[in-house]
Amino acid sequence: ILTSEALQEKKIAELAEQIASKKDVKMVLIAGPSSSSKTTFAKKLGLQLRIKGLKPVTIGTDDYFVERSLTPRDENGEYDFETIDALDLDLFNDHLTRLINGETVNIPTFDFKEGTKRYDDNKKLHLNDDEILVIEGIHCLNDKLTSKIPKENKFKIYISDLTVLNIDNFNRISTTDTRLVRRIVRDYNFRGYSAKETLDRWPSVNRGER
């Protein structure tokens, strides 16, 4: 385990070196399946970026959902939160553009229970010359997410959680099932969803990851 963790840290340090060497890069986009440790990876990468003299500033795509009344629905009439069209792409691109141009932006916080964005004057953001945006989400490799941002300003990374848990010598728990358990815990703690609601949405999550 310690060897695996050391190898991972080495790879993350190499990524930070690549990012720091590209002077035009203003944001790092981290993509991966739901509950695949993107947030944990982003924190580890942020530490390595600091070693290179860059201060990471995190923005979550989850705060840029459209209002609940505008959320697309799937073939069963249920809200489809996993499609990229559930995100307010115009606002997201506007904020990113203004940030890399040196402007100050009031970042929203999405209230999942009420289905609306909320704004707090204490959440205004401005990027200094030694700061870099770190953004993570399942759609971060999709050019539609950052369509207004020049290619040279973006550095994209894909990760996937491949940890295997064994029941015994012959049977294992799939990584998909492990991610589902993580998703159930996260949704309950941070989004106010019950385990049943997460299980009902899981097929939609899988579609959004493809």
Regions found by a protein language model. Give the residues of each.
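Glycine-rich phosphate-binding loop used to anchor ATP phosphates in small-molecule kinases
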Residues: 93-153, 195-210
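The Walker A (P-loop) glycine that initiates the GxxxxGKT/S ATP-binding motif of P-loop NTPases
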Residues: 32
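Extreme N-terminal, non-catalytic leader segments
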Residues: 1-29, 51, 57
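Conserved nucleotide-sensing/catalytic segment adjacent to the nucleotide-binding pocket
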Residues: 57-59, 66-115, 132
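Conserved glycine(s) of the Walker
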Residues: 37
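Conserved NTP phosphate-binding and transfer environment spanning the P-loop NTPase/kinase superfamily
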Residues: 23, 144-210
